[in-house]
Curated annotation (Swiss-Prot):
It comes from Jannaschia sp. (strain CCS1). This is Small ribosomal subunit protein uS7. Transmembrane segments: none annotated. The gene is rpsG. It comes from the Bacteria. SUPFAM superfamilies: Ribosomal protein S7. PANTHER family: RIBOSOMAL PROTEIN S7.
Length: 156
């Protein structure tokens, strides 16, 4: 692996229906086996359900849900003299977004509704209302960082 140049960040194209780049990233993460059309259908149908439940623009709901899931701090392992410490560090904006998307998808997949559309819609509604597994994951991450605040001077 060459150390000369950092890999170039590729721009994702905005999605067809709403023209939103974050939504495209979300669909790409949701996609399994390269089936983008299936991922798009799941997201758009989930958005229709969300719009029916909350009577609000689904893209706004999506972004609000992501904001409620994004972590501000996380812990990273750091070895110091034979001991491993969990050191709290701030999360970069790109990683915040990536973690929020990943947690939202995993929380949706873990739910008990029948279809992925229902699960995703339910998790989005829960995230907007500060409930649900994805928000709990963020809260747990923040608690972990808070509990290990004593080791913050090991930050690098």
């Amino acid at each position: 692996m060459s150390r000369r140049h950092a890999a170039e960040k590729r721009q994702v194209l905005p999605d067809a229906k709403f023209g939103d780049m974050v939504l495209t990233k979300f669909m790409n993460n949701l996609m399994i086996d390269g089936k983008k059309a299936v991922a798009e259908r799941i997201v758009y149908n989930a958005f229709d359900r969300v719009e029916g439940k909350l009577k609000r623009a689904p893209v706004e709901v999506f972004h609000e849900a992501l904001e409620n899931i994004k972590p501000a701090v996380e812990v990273r392992s750091r070895r110091v003299g034979g001991a491993t410490y969990q050191v709290p560090v701030d999360v970069r904006p790109e990683r915040r977004e990536a973690l929020a998307i990943r947690w939202l998808i995993n929380a949706s997949r873990a739910r008990n509704e029948n279809t992925m559309e229902e699960r995703l819609a339910g998790e989005l509604v829960d995230a907007v209302n500060m409930r649900g597994s994805a928000v709990k994951k963020r809260e747990d991450t923040h608690k972990m960082a808070d509990a290990n605040r004593a080791f913050s001077h090991y930050r690098w």
